[in-house]
A protein has these predicted regions:
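Charged catalytic cores and adjacent phosphate/nucleic-acid-binding surfaces used
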Residues: 1-7, 11, 15, 19-26, ...
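Flexible loop residues that form catalytic
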Residues: 41, 120, 146
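Aromatic-lined carbohydrate-recognition surfaces of secreted/lumenal glycan-active proteins
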Residues: 113-125
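A short, structured active-site edge motif that brings together acidic residues
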Residues: 62-69
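Divalent metal-dependent hydrolysis catalytic cores, especially in the metallo-beta-lactamase
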Residues: 24-45, 113-116
Length: 283
């Protein structure tokens, strides 16, 4: 039996999302997903709320949270309680922008959770090997994150997939959705082994899913999200924090992102027309 899960979604418990846990579940089901992981910034409250709200035995909700470390963001999956974050404020905002990598991974493992390195090459091209094979290491990596290519490094997902192969760690897929229309743009296909459909209540199958992920019985796939999601998310954050004076700046960034996309489409269309008029000569 194989199931498709979006393993990285933010709810309204994050400072930069307005989508409630209940709405996430409803949308994910309409898009054919078998489950989701709700992983908010610095808090597991959104995931636990979603877990409590889920009435469907054929749909799984995995509580999680996303933490900032010196080596990037780490998502903890299958969490049951908060990890102590110094300076935590409502909606996951924290006074401490980065936490020690080893402390975060150890705290996730102490709960029986899985530590996933999220969009590792979104803003860098290199990470030390011990993150993947040291005494304290992640269990998996996001091989496809729908937002990863919208920032500094367009090849972020290909670098992550290469890292998965090099170190032999599972590659997971997640949309990193902060907006409702992003849900399901990336997913992880998980092979539950010899389990047959109807033999198991998926809602209560956390241990089966966890076992399959750690065993590497996973595939990731998805589509990249439009780069405009970044300033849109920043607008949501400014609105929720009531820093309204910053909103015009993010509106300008949104316009620039949209114009850049239009310009790229025009350039591609012109290139296609030129190739149609002057097809390459065969040797």
């Amino acid at each position: 039996m194989k199931i498709d899960l979006d393993l990285h979604i933010h709810s309204s418990f994050s400072p930069d999302s307005l989508v409630s846990p209940g709405e996430i579940i409803r949308i994910a089901k309409t898009r054919g997903l078998d489950g989701v992981a709700i992983a908010d910034h610095n808090t597991v409250r959104g995931g636990i709320t979603g877990l409590d709200l889920n009435p469907d035995p054929d749909f799984i909700v995995i509580p999680g949270a996303e933490y900032s470390t010196e080596y990037g963001h780490v998502v903890g999956l299958f969490l049951s309680e908060e990890i102590d974050v110094k300076g935590r404020k409502p909606q996951g905002h924290t006074l401490s922008p980065t936490l020690p990598f080893e402390d975060v991974v150890n705290a996730i493992h102490a709960q029986g959770g899985i530590a996933v390195l999220a969009h590792p090459f979104q803003s860098r091209e290199w990470l030390p090997a011990h993150v993947f094979n040291g005494a304290v290491k992640v269990d998996a990596i996001e091989g496809f994150n729908s937002r990863a290519g919208t920032r500094a490094y367009p090849n972020a997902n290909s670098l992550a997939s290469r890292c998965s192969s090099e170190y032999g760690i599972p590659a997971l897929g997640g949309s990193d959705a902060h907006l409702s229309w992003e849900i399901g743009r990336a997913y992880t296909r998980i092979d539950l082994g010899g389990v047959s459909e109807g033999d198991v209540c998926l809602r209560d199958s956390h241990s089966l899913v966890k076992e399959a992920i750690l065993a590497g019985r996973v595939e990731c796939a998805g589509k990249q999200t439009h780069r405009a999601v970044v300033p849109l998310t920043e607008l949501v954050k400014a609105y929720k924090r009531k820093t309204y004076h910053r909103m015009p700046y993010f509106v300008l960034k949104l316009i620039v992102a949209m114009l850049g996309s239009v310009g790229l489409r025009i350039e591609n269309a012109q290139r296609e027309r030129a190739n149609a008029k002057n097809p390459p000569q065969q040797q």
